[in-house]
Design a protein with these regions (language model features):
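N-terminal first-folded block
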Residues: 1-27, 31
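Short alpha-helix capping/helix-loop boundary micro-motifs
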Residues: 32-37
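C-terminal structural segments of small proteins and small subunits
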Residues: 51-82
Length: 82
């Protein structure tokens, strides 16, 4: 899983039938920008949780996607580890 911030949207009026109903977001993870299928209604500025790779395709019933937004992060805590 990866954490990222939604920076934009992608619109595609013509797409494969298996992607019908999907909306797409541009998500920046701090090291890369990804286009992800949005399953939770995230919007610009939202911090989100992503799944990528084979897990993403399985999550979307084998649609040809590499990344899926599966959660909007409300709060994140980090602790120092020694």
């Amino acid at each position: 899983m990866k954490i990222g911030t939604v920076t934009g949207s992608v619109w595609a009026t013509r797409k494969a039938s298996c992607l019908s109903g999907h909306t797409f977001l541009v998500v920046y993870t701090g090291t890369e920008e990804l286009v992800a299928s949005d399953q939770v209604g995230a919007g610009p500025g939202d911090r989100v949780l992503l799944v990528t790779g084979n897990t993403a395709a399985r999550y979307c019933m084998d649609a040809p996607v590499d990344a899926v937004v599966v959660a909007i992060i409300d709060k994140q805590e980090t602790r120092e580890v020694y």
